[in-house]
């Protein structure tokens, strides 16, 4: 996969939207665990008050954002881990967060990894999908995506009927302009989108 070109050379918001419908999975020991990306968020670097790199912040914890596009950036909050990918050229610390997937591969293993939680609770949030894949640490932080057991299949894209742009989730401490910036993308009507109300679920999960 040509991740370097995919994650550079165009606005991060465009990259983020283009991830919707792509297969994303973790492959280890011959088993494939994952599904289609249904929700993602863009973070635009040093000027984005919601970004970990806002104001030029750089540390061991967020170094992944500063690396070349296509580098994995995994960060932790309490006992949870979250999966991001650096965008743009090295030194321009922008990135995308994979927020949710519709599970397709390795469902039995996902169910075990999530302690029996099933249905939409399996992967309808960024920490949940990492748990479902069995990822509990930052071991793959800073690794090039191409050299890791994670795969985003750029040769396939499940078409969505509608991709919605909305404010990012949980951004309350930032400047209102950034808190309300429409930098979250999701498949309209897909039940695996975090916070999607049951009344808004589509029978076809929002796919064409």
Curated annotation (Swiss-Prot):
GO molecular function per UniProt: alkylbase DNA N-glycosylase activity; DNA binding
Protein EC: 3.2.2.-
Listed GO biological process terms: base-excision repair
Keyword DNA repair belongs to the record: yes
Keywords carried by this UniProt record: DNA damage, DNA repair, Hydrolase
Protein name from the UniProt record: Putative 3-methyladenine DNA glycosylase
Top-rank taxon: Bacteria
Keyword rRNA processing: no
Species whose genome carries this gene: Lactobacillus delbrueckii subsp. bulgaricus (strain ATCC 11842 / DSM 20081 / BCRC 10696 / JCM 1002 / NBRC 13953 / NCIMB 11778 / NCTC 12712 / WDCM 00102 / Lb 14)
Leading EC class: hydrolase
Pfam families according to UniProt: Pur_DNA_glyco
Family (UniProt): Belongs to the DNA glycosylase MPG family.
């Amino acid at each position: 996969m040509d991740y370097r070109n995919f994650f550079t050379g165009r606005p991060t918001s465009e990259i983020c939207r283009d991830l919707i419908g792509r297969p994303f999975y973790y492959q280890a020991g011959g088993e494939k665990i994952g599904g289609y990306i249904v929700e993602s968020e863009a973070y635009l670097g040093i000027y984005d008050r919601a970004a970990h790199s806002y104001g030029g912040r750089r540390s061991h914890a967020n170094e992944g954002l500063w690396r070349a596009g296509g580098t994995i950036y995994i960060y932790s909050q309490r006992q949870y881990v979250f999966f991001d990918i650096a965008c743009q050229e090295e030194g321009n610390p922008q990135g995308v967060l994979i927020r949710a997937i519709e599970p397709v591969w390795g469902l039995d293993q996902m169910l075990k990894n999530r302690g029996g939680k099933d249905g939409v609770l399996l992967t309808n949030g960024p920490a949940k999908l990492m748990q479902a894949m069995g990822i509990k640490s930052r071991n793959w932080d800073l690794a090039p995506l191409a050299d890791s057991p994670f795969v985003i299949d750029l040769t396939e894209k499940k078409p969505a009927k509608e991709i919605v742009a909305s404010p990012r989730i949980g951004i309350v401490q930032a400047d209102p302009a950034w808190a309300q910036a429409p930098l979250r993308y999701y498949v309209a009507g897909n039940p695996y989108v975090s916070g999607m109300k049951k009344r808004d679920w589509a029978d076809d999960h929002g796919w064409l």
